């Protein structure tokens, strides 16, 4: 009987080590670098519009309009933002006030760009297609294309809260 009890105890301890552990934050940065052709398209847009922006290592460009003073969000942070997204032709494809997201669940350009500011900060991101929606058309509820494939995305984002 002691042998069976000992075996059961051993097996329960052994198998408990196989249980799924809390993996922490499931999100990660993909370390994607946009191709030079996409970077050149952004540079051409910036030049044509007399804009100055800082290059990120991913070949995205950004302007910190207000750095903020609060917390910097991590990938698993809940963020509250006001934003407007436009195309290089000036068409606004989306805007929201008080939008709530988990940073890590968003497009790569946002995962890389939003942590460049703190709570209360404002940033403008010039996101190449590779860090945005890539070669896919984005459609609205009616099926109309609101973001054509391979579009550069321009986002004006204010980080109002980090949770």
Predicted region positions:
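Cross-family detector of peptidyl-prolyl cis-trans isomerase
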Residues: 18-163
């Amino acid at each position: 009987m002691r042998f069976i009890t000992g075996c059961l105890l051993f097996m329960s301890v052994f198998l408990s080590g196989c249980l799924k552990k809390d993996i922490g934050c499931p999100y990660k940065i993909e370390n994607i670098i946009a191709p030079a052709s996409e970077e050149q398209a952004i540079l051409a847009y910036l030049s044509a519009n007399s804009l100055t922006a800082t290059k990120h290592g991913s070949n995205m460009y950004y302007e910190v309009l207000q750095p903020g003073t609060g917390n910097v969000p991590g990938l698993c942070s809940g963020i509250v933002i006001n934003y407007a997204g436009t195309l290089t032709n000036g068409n606004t494809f989306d805007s929201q006030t008080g939008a709530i997201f988990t940073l890590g669940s968003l497009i790569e350009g946002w995962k890389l760009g939003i942590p460049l500011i703190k709570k209360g900060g404002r940033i403008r991101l010039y996101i190449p297609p590779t860090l945005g929606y890539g070669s896919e058309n984005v459609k609205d509820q009616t099926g109309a294309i609101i973001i054509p494939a391979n579009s550069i995305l321009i986002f004006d984002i204010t980080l109002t809260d980090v949770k």
